[in-house]
């Protein structure tokens, strides 16, 4: 701050000593004072514009990155739903067949062909098999579910439109992962290597009223159908033609061999 003062002109050189004494004493300043304040140094405007521009650039860059990440997420979800899941569904569905020697129907071994559609659900740990009408006889068409979570097997005999439930036989039925690996290994060919057939016999024991207790997979298969429990016959016996009249056969495979399931005592 700069201070500038203006003193008034002296009226005369001569003066009384008393006047000098009084003049030497401090008196209210009658002088006119002007205060000058130095101008503040202003920052160059270009610095503000640069700082504002840099902040705006960061904001735009951040928004662009967010939009890019959202686009990548949506693209990943789209690819997963429409390509990966579709490919996974194709890999878990098999339409295959097997050639085997039939030693059960007659004493002469004849070559037979069995076809079936297989759906394997690895996450849910169950298998669903559809056996169409055999071309050369030998069994009924059926839908079969092997539920490894519940430890149950359900047969839906399409000809009779009835369901039969029994404990899962893990010595015959491969687990979903093992069965999937087997079918993937032979997927390049149409048929599995020629194999053989074994037989198991079931007996109807009781009617099932509470189908929900069988689990959701078997419930959806057997809902609205008469459902019965089965008991596996401990001793094998030769089924003659007369005894076979009261038995229904379902031929299927969930292993490297074919299984003929005889359901006897059919209501």
Swiss-Prot record:
Pfam families: BRICHOS. GO terms for molecular function: amyloid-beta binding; ATP binding. GO terms for cellular component: extracellular exosome; Golgi apparatus; lysosomal membrane; lysosome; perinuclear region of cytoplasm; plasma membrane. It is found in: Lysosome membrane; Cell membrane. The modification Phosphothreonine is found at residue 37. InterPro entries: BRICHOS_dom, ITM2. This is Integral membrane protein 2C. Keywords: Cell membrane, Cleavage on pair of basic residues, Disulfide bond, Glycoprotein, Lysosome, Membrane, Phosphoprotein, Signal-anchor, Transmembrane, Transmembrane helix. Belongs to the ITM2 family. Type I membrane-bound, as well as soluble, furin has a pre-eminent role in ITM2C proteolytic processing. PCSK7 and PCSK5 may also be involved although to a lesser extent. The soluble form of PCSK7 is incapable of processing ITM2C. Fails to undergo shedding by ADAM10 and intramembrane cleavage by SPPL2B.
